[in-house]
Amino acid sequence: ITGNTGYHLWFLYTLIMLYIATPLFRLITCHASKRQLEYALVVWIIFSLIAGQINSFAAEFGFDEVLSLYVPFVITGYGGYFLLGHYLTSYPLKGAAKRRCYILAILSACVICGGKWILPMTFKIETAAVEAPLGLFSCLVAGAVFTVSQNISISDTGTRVLPFLGQRTFGIYLTHVFFISLLYHIWHVKPDYCQPVLAIFVSSVGVFAASLFVSWIMSKIPLLRKFV
């Protein structure tokens, strides 16, 4: 999956490593106390998310990775999200902690949107550092979304639909870029074909529906169903 392939396939390497590391994470989650999990998450947030995001911003402004010498090899990368999901499942946020989580998530979303608007205008820099998936702002938003999902009541229909969608997610991940390329690069559909907000919604739903359909078809093929 190297070379001239879909740009989204880089994440397959991460998925493979996460699956390899899953037994180790299971040991941690089965035997660690709440305080130990909190310690691991704090280490991850400081040395992976915050340090990584600072390094990303430094690189965008032409500096070396200013914290490269001070980042120890600890729980890093997407593995921290594994632990965060387990922690929030085992110890759901309540009361003031939940409200603070939502406030920080809203502020983070504002920082992400504001940064994407202000940085190009002020410094002439187009950067993805502000919304980096392994960054503090994205983590706060993800944690809030996870917390919200824990408090949603699901109907009987939803309990049937969600497992079906869950089984199709990997196929959707693999195929959605094909439909994006088909839409914008082969059919040359312009992003401004209608009102921008509506265009984003229509395009997103269309790509998702097409990818879901193809993923479902692939799941019916014996050779492919093992993978999707």
Question: How would you describe each model-predicted region?
Answer:
Residues I1-V228:
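Alpha-helical transmembrane segments and their immediate juxtamembrane cytosolic regions
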